Amino acid sequence: MLHTMIQKACKKWFSSDECKIKNLISYMISTGELRDAQIEAIKTYLFLKIACDNKPLYELFCNGAFNSLSEEELNSMELSTLTRETLLSNKAALAWYEYASQKTEKGGQVSVKLTEEIKKNPQNINYETIFKKIFYGVTYSDYLFSLPMGAGKTFLMAAFIYIDLYFAMQNPADSRFARNFIILAPSGLKTSVIPSLRTIQEFNPAWVLPEPTASEIKRQMIFEVLDENKSAKKSNRTKNPNVQKLALHQPFEDLTGLVAVTNAEKVILDGLVRAEQGELFEESSETKDREANELRYWIGKLPQLSVFIDEVHHATDGDIKLRSVVNRWANGEKKNVTNVIGFSGTPYLDKAEKIPVTDSLSVASSDISNTVYYYPLVDAIGNFLKYPIVKVSDNKDSMQIVESGVREFLQKYKDTIYDRPPRTLQAKLAVYCGKGIDFLEEEVYPFISNLIMEYGLNPNEHILRYHDGNKNCQRNEHFHKKIFHRSFCPADNNFDFFSNNFCKY
């Protein structure tokens, strides 16, 4: 519920004369390409960057950046003189009191016990320390944007990147805005997340910035996908092609516009790595860190770096290690991290965390504390997500059900093309085969292949089969390569077939 205080302050700022980005936001709205949720997230992003000076959340809350209760309102409340004086003089105390007094979605109060404790013993609570603990002691700007799947998180990332570059190029000395970007995808989702992140390269910056500025910035962009596996020779010395990709952009002092995407596990590995591409490296005294993880070391050298962490809620197991890496980048000798921006569809912890307030009272919350913007799934469903249509059949023959579905799809969408510059997209049908890989390969695939040929479609061009393979059927490597690079395809296959192995993902 801390994010509701941020949103309230953001709206007040945006409606004030102090806000100088109204014309920019009006332009974004006029293009008609961004959803309301994305526009509101961008407002929040710029509010934190400009009005809040890109400061860490614990500092902002301690300084009362999001407080809204006035002295007049406090004087009208039933408070003791000591409590009122404490709330008027201690901005962190007022922030906690305002937080605890908020109404929940169900109409209750966030924390009756905390408000009562502040009223009874206002001077017995170390308010600043509680804020530091609830934000994990982070001393840099670390903001989480929560939007459900399908709301456009990937394009929101792209918008943030172009907005930062726009302001950074106007004033290179302004450290609030990043010049280079690293996007970390969660380890378990690399086959699905990294490909979608590649769509950032296709984002049209004219959706958020007017021409010719948009095109000028895009021409300066450099995209690197750090997805290569290390290769080892007989000498037991390892070459890391991902490091080579970064090293080629030296010198780093003036580097601007690099967007690199990698898997989170590639920067939290602890194994010793010795590289052979020594001719690419600059001399450094940080030998121990460099040997621990070459890629981590080189990412840490990028100037004015913004770290994007996608699908934060999927990375809980490695969160401590990943946080430690980011802390090293942010607090190292160069202190080159401009901010850390997280994206998630579910801004909740698996279980509530308890932060001690006094010896006898703790504050418990299941919200991820650094959430600054939250767009609920229920709002997304009401505004733009698709409603499922469930059809019931009395026919028990599964192949006849498949035939009915495929024919209906082809009759309705066969020639439908979605023009979404710079690419065009075809309508797609996914067929999930719960009976296993053998049934998919031996029954479903031949059946649908013959079926779509009746409509003039070539099965080799319009069907992709996905499964991990078994002793009878090999894994379709062509599919994995295709799905990984599909962001660059001008037109995609119409049919995706999945076996029950897909449940693993």
Predicted feature descriptions by range:
Residues V138-L144, A178-R179, L425-K428:
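Pre-Walker A (Motif I) flank of P-loop NTPase domains
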